[in-house]
Design a protein with these regions (language model features):
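Multi-pass membrane proteins that catalyze or facilitate reactions on polyprenyl-/lipid-phosphate substrates
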Residues: 1-170
Length: 170
C-alpha cells in the first residue's frame, strides 16, 4: 500500500495523462494482466501467510496497477499467490489493502477542494453509497470464491483477447 501512496501523491498528474486515450498502452497492460492471472492460476496452493516483505512487494504491484489496463486486484492477487501466499488470504488481503487508498484519496480531494458536498444531493449520494457498498461486497465475495477454485484463467483469457483487440485497433 505504501508504494501506491508514494506513486499516487508524487506522480498524480503524470498518471492522469496516461488515461488520455492511449489504447495501445491499455492493450499492452491488459496482456500483462492476462499473463499475471494465468501464472497465478497455475501456481501451487500453499497455506503461507502474507509477511511484511511480501506485503511491500504486493504494494509495489498495486502501485504498478495504477497504469491503465492493469487490474489492481488482478495484479495484487497474482503477485501474492506467486510469492507463495494462500490464495484465499491473497484475495482478502488484496481487497483490504485498497480501503486505506480509497479513503486517503477522498480525504486528499476534500482537503484540496476537488471534492465538495451538495446537501441537496444527500438522498442520491446515500442510495449510491449503499448500492456501491452492496455490489462491492458481492463482487469481493465472488472474486474470492473464484480465486479459491483457481478460475483466474478465464479472466486471463478475457484480458488477453481484449488486449489484443485494443492493440489491433489502436
Amino acid at each position: 500500500m505504501i508504494p501506491a501512496v508514494v506513486i499516487g501523491v508524487f506522480f498524480e498528474k503524470e498518471l492522469e495523462q496516461l488515461f488520455g486515450g492511449n489504447i495501445m498502452l491499455v492493450g499492452c497492460m491488459l496482456l500483462v494482466t492476462a499473463l499475471l492471472l494465468f501464472l497465478a492460476d497455475k501456481a501451487k496452493d500453499t497455506q503461507k501467510k502474507v509477511s511484511f516483505s511480501n506485503a511491500f512487494i504486493i504494494g509495489v504491484s498495486q502501485a504498478i496497477a495504477m497504469l491503465p489496463g492493469i487490474s489492481r486486484s488482478g495484479a495484487t492477487i497474482s503477485t501474492s499467490v506467486l510469492l507463495g501466499n494462500d490464495k484465499t488470504k491473497a484475495a482478502r488481503f488484496s481487497f483490504l489493502m485498497v480501503v486505506p487508498l480509497i479513503f486517503g484519496k477522498i480525504a486528499k480531494d476534500i482537503l484540496s477542494g476537488d471534492l465538495t458536498y451538495d446537501s441537496g444531493n444527500f438522498t442520491s449520494l446515500s442510495i449510491g453509497f449503499v448500492a456501491a457498498f452492496i455490489s462491492g461486497l458481492f463482487a469481493c465475495t465472488w472474486m474470492i470464491a473464484l480465486v479459491k477454485k483457481s478460475k483466474l484463467t478465464y479472466f486471463a483469457i478475457y484480458c488477453g483477447v481484449v488486449g489484443l483487440i485494443a492493440i489491433i485497433f489502436s
